[in-house]
């Protein structure tokens, strides 16, 4: 019998990753300030280093939690797509989920390459290209969940929240 809802662990991982991603996307100032100082040859103060470390450690936590989440997804599975929808909707959902997983690995890895290894191109990729792509995919993910709930009247949103 296919699962009808995500497990409690899957839900906790989903919303923990969502909260950490929101934190790093909405509050990147510590890393940005540290980067500006280093770029201009200035010495970061301990508070600057601490703020940058918080951003980096949140990114590492995201990487770890996404790896655990993906392992659980592979071993335990996920609820099936709702019936009665156009096949393109299922393909789009799969594409967005796959790209989100890829970005949630690429963002922390590129950030670590920039911060800990000093690889400038990784920093540019991280802060400009991947960050923009992540915002777009997050928008698509939220829009898709809302469309499932309000337009298609499916249980997709409920099974990641209350069910």
Per-region residue spans from a language model:
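Membrane-embedded alpha-helical bundles that constitute the cytochrome b-like, heme-associated redox core
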Residues: 1-163
């Amino acid at each position: 019998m296919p699962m009808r809802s995500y497990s409690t662990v899957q839900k906790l991982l989903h919303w923990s990753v969502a909260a950490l991603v929101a934190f790093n996307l909405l509050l990147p100032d510590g890393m940005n300030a540290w980067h500006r100082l280093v770029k201009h040859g200035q010495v970061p103060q301990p508070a600057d280093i601490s703020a940058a470390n918080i951003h980096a450690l949140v990114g590492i936590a995201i990487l770890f939690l996404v790896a655990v989440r993906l392992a659980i997804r592979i071993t335990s599975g996920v609820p099936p797509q709702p019936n009665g929808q156009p096949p393109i909707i299922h393909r789009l959902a799969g594409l967005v989920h796959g790209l989100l997983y890829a970005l949630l690995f690429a963002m922390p890895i590129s950030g670590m390459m920039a911060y800990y290894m000093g690889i400038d191109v990784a920093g540019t990729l991280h802060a400009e290209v991947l960050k923009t792509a992540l915002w777009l995919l997050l928008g698509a993910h939220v829009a898709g969940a809302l469309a499932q709930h309000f337009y298609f009247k499916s249980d997709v949103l409920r099974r990641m929240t209350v069910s």
